[in-house]
Curated annotation (Swiss-Prot):
This is Brain natriuretic peptide. Keywords: Disulfide bond, Hormone, Secreted, Signal, Vasoactive. Cardiac hormone which may function as a paracrine antifibrotic factor in the heart. Also plays a key role in cardiovascular homeostasis through natriuresis, diuresis, vasorelaxation, and inhibition of renin and aldosterone secretion. Has a cGMP-stimulating activity. Disulfide bonds join C108-C124. Belongs to the natriuretic peptide family. InterPro entries: Natr_peptide (IPR000663), Natr_peptide_CS (IPR030480), Natriuretic_peptide (IPR050787), Natriuretic_peptide_brain (IPR002408). Residues 44-53 have a biased composition (Acidic residues).
Length: 133
């Protein structure tokens, strides 16, 4: 009795083993459906590539995006614009020189600690606003 029960359980396990895998066995109808879908996809992709490859016959008559007049106008810079550019750049350089964050720090603690140290004479650079040397 025990042997027949074990053999029946073993046979059931063997028959159900393919169903428990992560890749189930497909029937013929499933394979046929997948092949039909694949053929439809290939046909639609080939039609799209043919449409993309078609070039219009009047491609020679098309004008370039930038005409010659536009490029010539871009190349000519008025003297007023040159002067404005120079003024802007000189203002930027003045701002960079005057700006505290753009100056290099010579202290051993960094900019913020240097400011605190100069006010309280606790940093490496003790020469400051309230503590003249």
């Amino acid at each position: 009795m025990v042997v027949s029960f074990v053999s029946i359980c073993g046979l059931l396990l063997i028959f159900n083993l393919p169903l428990s895998t992560s890749f189930p066995v497909l029937s013929d109808t499933d394979v046929d459906v997948l092949e039909a879908i694949l053929h439809k996809l290939e046909e639609s992709m080939s039609e799209e590539t043919e449409e993309d490859q078609m070039v219009p016959a009047n491609s020679e008559s098309l004008e370039p995006v930038g005409s010659m007049k536009q490029t010539a106008n871009r190349d000519q810079i008025r003297p007023v614009e040159v002067e404005a550019i120079r003024e802007f750049l000189s203002a930027n350089t003045r701002k960079n020189v005057q700006n505290d964050s753009s100056r290099r720090s010579s202290s051993c603690f960094g900019r913020r600690m240097d400011r605190i140290g100069s006010m309280s004479s606790l940093g490496c650079n003790t020469v400051g606003k309230y503590n003249p040397k």
